[in-house]
Amino acid sequence: MFLIILIYQAEWMRTPESGIAHITLLDQFTRNTKRATAGAWSGDERGLRNALDMIYSGKYAKLPQVMQAMTLMPLMHAEHSEIQDLSAYHYSELAKKSEHIDYNGSAKSHRDVVVNFGRFPARNKYLGRETTALEAVYQANGGKF
């Protein structure tokens, strides 16, 4: 199934609605079907590229707020501080438009982890990365990401 998601990318990205479906599959499908393996993040790079494409092409602005929030998920999951800043900005803009959904909390907590560590320490053991002493303390104290 993942191969189909990748092969037909151009078709998926033709409309804002199918674009968000594709981004959600890339961002969430792999996280849930390949949990606790390096494959959990195998859709991240393409999902991020597609999300940025949606934002900068103007398709993002045509989506309802909930779909905009889903479009931003790959930004929130990126291990790049500049992308995290962009995520926090867009989620804060969504929060200004919504009285009922707190879009800021999760975006800020993801951003803080990447700003502090340059990555998400919880991924280390699955990606074969060494965990630093500070990351170990963070994880021992309930760090989520």
Give names to the regions the model predicted.
Residues 1-145:
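Intrinsically disordered, low-complexity activation-like regions
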